[in-house]
Regions:
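Pre-active-site segment of Zn-dependent metallo-hydrolases
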Residues: 9-11, 21-80, 84-134, 188-197, ...
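Active-site neighborhood of phospho(di)ester-bond hydrolases with catalytic His/Asp-centered motifs
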Residues: 28-30, 54-63, 70, 82-85, ...
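Metallo-beta-lactamase
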Residues: 99-163, 291-330
Length: 535
């Protein structure tokens, strides 16, 4: 058998693995690249296989970096089953059409501008019809149910504890007299997350394809509820708003769960709470109607509140654009949860535009922020940022609450793997920025005494039973991380020219500052030299 790595290589997004077993081909995940414009442009590239030859897709969970290119796959000829859990199908039924609307809107906008310039018509990456046709191919499988994907390949979904419906994949492959056991982790969640169950214990495998999103980090053990309460109380005292860019699926529901608990305990005031995202509204409804996936605490609360997981009189779900716009006209402090979680699109941009300049407001990030996104730039301390074409001064307090991550950290992943009965022959380590993948791979090798490999895009693992060898890709493709670095450095060049002009004006008006400015610039120059020496 062969496994070709066609996404999430040395980056976090775009998960896609092509498996070839004899004459049969199928995929595990088919996700979108997310982040900067240059990284998202990778979605436009042709698949490195013919979609019509793919017999099936095994989908680990609904997040679009794992599911988002399924409509494109169908558009280009795929007609096989897409296997997933019930909740994953329900969540994809809102996520995929939403992505299609975005693609259609971006194409329409590009064509309006392009027609005036005489440019070629731009086709959307995929349409709402493509998303609908993809959803009709979904085949539901329960956790713990073994099923055949193609001849000789059996798959079982196990609880991954990442989001509702998320699964890691246990796979058994029989080729002649050779048998291979594989695990594809998808995304593994933190233990003790609210609402959903912890990741199930895996029995072991010959080879594991592991995520590494937080492979170089340890989640801080601290009182998340307490910090959230402090942020809200401090902001209300200042008279501002709490704006939370949050993933519509998973994070929004966890935040509501915490707010309900804090209010019930009298730790935060009962100010208006707005969920301003049609997708988050529907995802919350899906979460409320799947109690079979709740953990013990959530099940008890659900029963106690009359089959309602979240019940707050001050909670508002906005549907229309008019309702969304009206939020910023309402006096008094409020909490606004809106998508997207990385602040790179959606209604959250309007709320950032209205609140970033305000010293009394707070912006709270409670999730991973990919390279190149507005969220990443804000948590890294940028002082001015362009939102919806407007240059905005960042005066609001910016908080980065890392403990809310739905991804296991390095220690949690190591503990999960150490609990397995058998050590695999090798770990393949995609789904992480290079520094995270490298640190996790090193830790796995040292702690478990097993081989590790961090794939490049297009690399292929050839496996016979428990023997394996890598075939490095001959394709020339710049890694997403390198693409993003190039874009970042272009931004640095623009910033340098702006700063140079400002410095020259300051010194022209205040010649006595020239010596001080030169000394500081010399320090900066030396610092840049030191960086290059370290490389």
């Amino acid at each position: 058998m062969k496994i070709t790595f066609l996404g999430a290589t040395r980056t976090v997004t775009g998960s896609c693995y092509l498996l070839e077993v004899g004459a049969h081909k199928f995929l595990v995940d088919c996700g979108m690249f997310q982040g900067s414009k240059l990284i998202k442009a990778l979605n436009e590239k042709e698949f490195l296989f013919h979609p019509g030859e793919i017999e099936a897709v095994v989908l680990t969970h609904a997040h679009v970096d794992h599911s988002g290119l399924l409509p494109k796959l169908v558009k280009e000829g795929f007609r096989g089953p897409i296997y997933c859990t019930k909740s994953t199908e329900e969540l994809c039924s809102i996520l995929l059409p939403d992505r299609a609307h975005i693609q259609e809107g971006e194409a329409e906008y590009a064509n309006r501008k392009g027609m005036r310039a005489g440019k070629k018509i731009v086709e959307p990456l995929f349409t709402v019809d493509d998303a609908s046709r993809a959803l009709h191919l979904f085949k539901l499988r329960s956790f713990g149910e073994a099923f055949n994907v193609v001849p000789g390949v059996t798959v079982t979904f196990r609880v991954a504890g990442h989001i509702l419906g998320s699964a890691f994949v246990e796979m058994s492959v029989n080729e002649g007299d050779k048998k291979t056991r594989l695990i594809f982790t998808g995304d593994i969640g933190q233990p003790n997350q609210p609402i959903i169950e912890d990741p199930a214990v895996a029995g072991g495998a010959d080879f594991i394809i592991t995520e590494s999103t937080y492979g170089n980090r340890i989640h801080e053990a601290y009182d998340k509820e307490g910090e959230l309460a402090n942020i809200i109380n401090d902001t209300v005292e200042r008279g501002g708003n709490v704006i939370i860019p949050a993933f519509a699926v998973g994070r929004t529901q966890v935040l509501l769960y915490y707010f309900q608990k804090l209010q019930a305990e009298g730790k935060i005031p009962e100010i208006p709470i707005y969920v301003d995202s049609p997708m988050a509204n529907r995802a919350t409804q899906i979460t409320m109607t799947n109690p079979e996936e709740y953990d013990e605490e959530a099940r008890a609360l659900y029963a106690m509140q009359g089959r309602r997981l979240v019940s707050m009189h001050n909670l508002r779900f906005t549907a229309t654009v008019q309702e969304s716009m009206a939020i910023n006209e309402i006096p008094g402090s409020k909490i606004v949860i809106s998508a997207s979680g990385m602040a790179d699109a959606g209604r959250i941009l309007h709320h950032l535009k209205h609140n970033l300049w305000r010293e009394d407001s707070s912006i709270v990030f409670a999730g991973y922020q990919a390279e190149g996104t507005i969220g990443r730039r804000l948590i890294e301390g940028i002082k001015r940022i362009k939102i919806m074409g407007e240059d905005i001064r960042v005066n609001a307090k910016i908080y980065n609450m890392k403990g809310f991550s739905a991804h296991a950290d390095k220690q949690q992943l190591l503990a999960w793997y150490s609990s397995m009965k058998e050590v695999p022959k090798a770990f393949f380590v995609p789904h992480g920025e290079l520094d995270a993948a490298m640190e996790l791979a090193d830790s796995l090798g040292r702690n478990l005494g097993t081989a590790t490999y961090i794939p490049h895009f297009g690399d292929c693992a050839e496996i016979h039973g428990t023997e394996w060898q890598m075939h490095e890709s001959e394709m020339v493709q710049v890694e997403p991380a390198a693409i993003d670095l190039r874009a970042f450095m272009r931004g640095m060049e623009r910033d340098y020219l702006l700063q140079r002009s400002k410095i020259e004006q300051i010194v022209a008006r205040n010649p006595d500052k020239a010596v001080m400015v030169r000394k500081k610039l010399e320090k900066l120059h030396k610092y840049m030299d030191d960086i290059l020496k370290d490389l």
